[in-house]
């Protein structure tokens, strides 16, 4: 999961009240603007580019995004640009301290394609998927059927964990830290990947099981033959949550833009689900049931 450590940017105040003087009495009832024209007016006030979908993204952050446009957020941006009738452009910046401030907050782009819902660094759209931290292990191992960090089998296993993530708290709760191999939370993604390093250690036998953010676990599991097993961790209690809703992030002032994105999410949820499933993302509905390719129309 992505982690940033910056303060929220200041809202941009625009002199929009003067527009009210331009409204001719009775004109609104005589000719209501279409939804598209209302969107266009709102976006012009909000300084959202009306012709270009300007996306803020990390250039080295698979499975989410990269400069080769191979990530699922790249593909989602392509889908939305097509639906909006816009061209697509990127502002690239590493997903680390300063990401929001240097991209969305500086008006260099208009949307972050994936952000935890409720994070106060951005204004969130409605969520378009829900997922969780997950176990990742070799198929056919004696960990088949595991679904909790309290499972007794883990006491004899070497466990890979990204330090500082919510899942690491449960290793402490279950007295498993002595069995853990930590991986760095913040790395230079141009040259390093904690998720990829963990999967390599799993393949070599350095660790027996890894705990990764679900989209990363699913993506790397699909790269192997046979595919690695991915099991969302859904039963933990007494610590931080491990399940999250993911939305898009916009500026707090851009309410019309947020509404437009919300409509796109609602109208294209099945296509969004299918795209994410294709990348191995373990999708969950609100009852923690898996959303699969057999039933991709369900909402998060």
Language-model features: locations:
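Bacterial N-terminal signal peptides
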Residues: 13-24
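Extended ligand-binding regions for polar small-molecule ligands
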Residues: 31-38, 71-83, 140-143, 147-166, ...
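Ligand-binding clefts/hinges and TM-proximal coupling segments of bilobed small-molecule sensing domains
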Residues: 31-37, 45, 166-187, 229, ...
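Periplasmic-binding protein-like
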Residues: 58-59, 130-142, 222-265, 282-300
């Amino acid at each position: 999961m992505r982690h940033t450590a910056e303060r929220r940017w200041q809202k941009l105040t625009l002199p929009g009240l003067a527009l009210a003087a331009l409204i001719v009495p009775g004109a609104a009832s005589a000719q209501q603007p279409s939804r598209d024209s209302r969107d266009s007016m709102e976006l012009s006030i909000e300084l959202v580019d009306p012709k270009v979908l300007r996306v803020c993204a990390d250039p080295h952050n698979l499975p989410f995004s990269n400069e080769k446009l191979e990530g699922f957020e790249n593909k989602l941006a392509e889908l939305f640009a097509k639906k909006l009738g816009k061209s697509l452009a990127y502002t690239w910046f590493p997903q680390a301290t300063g990401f929001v401030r240097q991209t969305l907050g500086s008006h260099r782009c208009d949307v972050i394609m994936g952000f935890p819902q409720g994070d106060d660094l951005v204004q969130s759209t409605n969520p378009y998927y829900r997922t969780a931290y997950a176990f990742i292990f070799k198929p056919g191992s004696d960990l088949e059927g595991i679904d909790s960090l309290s499972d007794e089998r883990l006491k004899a296993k070497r466990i890979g964990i990204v330090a500082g993530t919510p899942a690491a708290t449960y290793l402490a709760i279950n007295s498993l830290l002595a069995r853990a191999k930590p991986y760095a939370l913040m790395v230079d993604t141009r040259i390093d990947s904690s998720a990829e390093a963990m999967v390599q250690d799993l393949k070599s036998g350095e660790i027996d099981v890894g705990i990764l953010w679900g989209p990363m676990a699913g993506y790397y599991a699909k790269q192997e033959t046979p595919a690695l097993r991915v099991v969302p961790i859904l039963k933990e209690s007494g610590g931080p949550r491990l399940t999250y809703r993911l939305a898009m992030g916009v500026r707090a002032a851009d309410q019309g833009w947020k509404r437009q994105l919300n409509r796109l999410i609602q109208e294209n949820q099945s296509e969004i689900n299918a795209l994410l499933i294709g990348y191995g993302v373990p999708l969950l509905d609100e009852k923690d049931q898996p959303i699969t390719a057999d039933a991709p129309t369900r909402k998060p």
